[in-house]
C-alpha cells in the first residue's frame, strides 16, 4: 500500500514534465469541479399554468419589472436600437420580443444575476434581482411573463427547455 513517501515530490515533478502536466491538469479539473458543483443552481419550477404562481408573478412584475419592460410587457420604444450609451432599451416580454427565444435557465440567470449573466463586455441596464427577489419569486415573474404568450410561442419556448 502506498504511503505519503511514495507520492511525487516537487523536485520529481520538475524533473518529469509529463508528470507535472498531469498533476496540473488533475488540479485544474478538481478545482473546476469543486467550483461548479458548489455553485450549481437547481432551477425552480416555472409553471405558466399554475395560477397561484402566475398571480404572484403578476404582482412582482408590476412592482419590479414594469417600470422598464412596460405594464403590458411591451418593452421600451425602439428597443432594438442602441441608446447613446451604447446599451439597448428594455425589450418587450410579450410575443413581439425575444424573451421566448431563450430557455428558462437563461431567463432565470439574467433575472437573478443581471449583468453578471451576460458575456464579458456586454453592457446592459438590467439589474440583478437575486438579492431583492427569492428564486421562487423570480420563477413566479417568469411564469407570469410566459402566461401572456400565445400557446404556440409557449410550446416553442418549452421545446428550448427540453433541449438542455
Locations of regions flagged by a protein language model:
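Electrostatic cytochrome c docking/interface patches
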Residues: 36-60, 155-157
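Short, solvent-exposed mixed-charge patches
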Residues: 163-164
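N-terminal Sec-pathway targeting helices
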Residues: 6-25
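Extracytoplasmic electron-transfer domains, predominantly the class I c-type cytochrome c fold
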Residues: 82-147
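Periplasmic/extracellular electron-transfer cofactor-ligation site
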Residues: 52, 58-89, 112-122, 147-155
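N-terminal intrinsically disordered, acidic low-complexity segments at the extreme N-terminus
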Residues: 1-2
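C-terminal capping alpha-helices of c-type cytochrome domains
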Residues: 22, 26-36, 105, 127-159
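Short N-terminal helix-initiation segments at or just after the protein's N-terminus
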Residues: 28-43, 71-74, 90
Amino acid at each position: 500500500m502506498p504511503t505519503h513517501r511514495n507520492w511525487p515530490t516537487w523536485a520529481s515533478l520538475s524533473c518529469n514534465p509529463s508528470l507535472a502536466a498531469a498533476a496540473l491538469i488533475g488540479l485544474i479539473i478538481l478545482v473546476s469541479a469543486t467550483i461548479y458543483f458548489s455553485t450549481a443552481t437547481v432551477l425552480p419550477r416555472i409553471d405558466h399554468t399554475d395560477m397561484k404562481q402566475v398571480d404572484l408573478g403578476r404582482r412582482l412584475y408590476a412592482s419590479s419589472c414594469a417600470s422598464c419592460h412596460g405594464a403590458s410587457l411591451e418593452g421600451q420604444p425602439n428597443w432594438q436600437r442602441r441608446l447613446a450609451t451604447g446599451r439597448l432599451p428594455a425589450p418587450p416580454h410579450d410575443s413581439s420580443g425575444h424573451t421566448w427565444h431563450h430557455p428558462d435557465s437563461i431567463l432565470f440567470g439574467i433575472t437573478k444575476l443581471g449583468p453578471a449573466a451576460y458575456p464579458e463586455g456586454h453592457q446592459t441596464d438590467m439589474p440583478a434581482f437575486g438579492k431583492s427577489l427569492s428564486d421562487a419569486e423570480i420563477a413566479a415573474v417568469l411564469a407570469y411573463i410566459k402566461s401572456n404568450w400565445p400557446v404556440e410561442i409557449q410550446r416553442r419556448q418549452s421545446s428550448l427547455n427540453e433541449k438542455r
